[in-house]
Amino acid sequence: MDFDRNIFEVRQSRRNPFLVAHRGVSGANVPCNSMAAFQIALHQGADVVEIDVTRTKNGKHLVFHPGKEPVFLKSCPIPEMTAAEVSELCLLNADSAPTSYKVPTLEEVLTFLKGRAYINVDKFWTDVEGISRVIRETGVEKQVIVKTYTDEESLDAVAKYAPDFMFMPMVRGKDDVTDTLLARGVNIIGTEVLFSKETDEVISDAYIRAMHEKGLLVWANAIVYDERDVISAYHTDDISLSKDPALGWGWLCDKGVDFIQTDWLFALKNYLENRRKEN
């Protein structure tokens, strides 16, 4: 993949959306956000690998979803531990049994993915300055996609510490920030759209068309991380696998989104390849 090329141009040269591996590809004995999960994501053809970032109490950035310590480590929160203490722990598998996999550092993951896929750094807003520093030190500025909420504090931090990084604000239901950000001097490449209803502005044909006319991309999520938080109007991985992929992944593709984030990368890729042959 040519990371020197404008990502909108890369998307225009493709028929299918970019495939985003949520926390890598995990399951069974392979924990999410582990080096094995990221290796599998590459093997299965991920265009983008999504990672989560947290920080120890002595300031070391690790790849782990904040707040998930009771699930994946059976420990106290990582921000209450030193990096050395975390390094003694093993990630747990789907049956809560310990594995040989450790919590990787942000440097390890970025170095591993360097030159191999786009990298979506989630939880970027928790420490824009510090995470940006690690991104620059590892030399992956051109392949990293960062996202934040649309509060002024987060947007100011992006403008100050990461104005050159590919940036996507997360918008829910409607978009009140894109036009402002275009004039703000940040490298906005599109939006991550969260929508509970098919009638929401951010998934309308008019919105997606207008974004594309501006040279901007639209990121949608098929993942279900909490059934109580509907972020794709039920056009999800779950319905794609349990009923009909046309109701989930196919619907998102037909809307014209440019990224689909999934927990079932291989199945989504296989569906899109077969769909292309049929069309």
Segments the model singles out, each with a brief description of its role:
Residues 1-279:
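Phosphate-group recognition and catalysis centered on beta-loop-alpha active-site segments
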